[in-house]
């Protein structure tokens, strides 16, 4: 596999969750991740979703930088998602969100 994105609708909250985004190391920085994100954004708009959400780890600086470049903002964190020592281990779960234009909280990238 060279790249993939997995999305999951949350009906009760009208959100679209990105549960997996992966691009092979040798194909990174070629626009593939951006293309996959644009597909997710298009799907979210088609479905009338209000926000796209995803999670990453505080130690994954490359992913955080990429998501921010795609217009995602920090919307929360969980300091004990993985272990009871997440903060000590510098591996806190970050929740990020991209608000769609049809939302009253629209954020333009």
Task: Set out the residue ranges of the language-model regions.
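A generic structural signal for short
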Residues: 28-29, 51-52
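C-terminal "cap" of GNAT-fold acetyltransferases
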Residues: 50, 57-61, 70-73, 80-109
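Alpha-helical transmembrane segments of multi-pass integral membrane proteins
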Residues: 44, 53-56
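Acetyl-CoA-dependent GNAT
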Residues: 1-19, 24, 37-38, 80, ...
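Alpha-helix C-cap/termination motif
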Residues: 10, 46-47
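Short alpha-helical
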Residues: 13, 61-62
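Conserved acetyl-CoA-binding loop-helix of GNAT-fold acetyltransferases
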Residues: 23, 29-46, 65-69
């Amino acid at each position: 596999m060279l790249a993939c994105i997995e999305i999951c609708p949350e009906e009760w909250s009208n959100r679209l969750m990105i549960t997996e985004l992966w691009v092979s190391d040798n194909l990174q920085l070629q626009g593939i991740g951006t293309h996959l994100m644009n597909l997710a954004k298009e799907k979210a708009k088609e479905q009338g979703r209000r926000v796209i959400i995803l999670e990453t780890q505080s130690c994954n600086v490359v992913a955080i930088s990429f998501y921010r470049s795609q217009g995602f903002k920090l919307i929360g964190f969980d300091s004990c998602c993985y272990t009871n020592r997440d903060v000590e281990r510098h591996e806190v779960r970050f929740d990020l969100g991209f608000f769609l234009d049809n939302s009253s909280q629209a954020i333009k990238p």
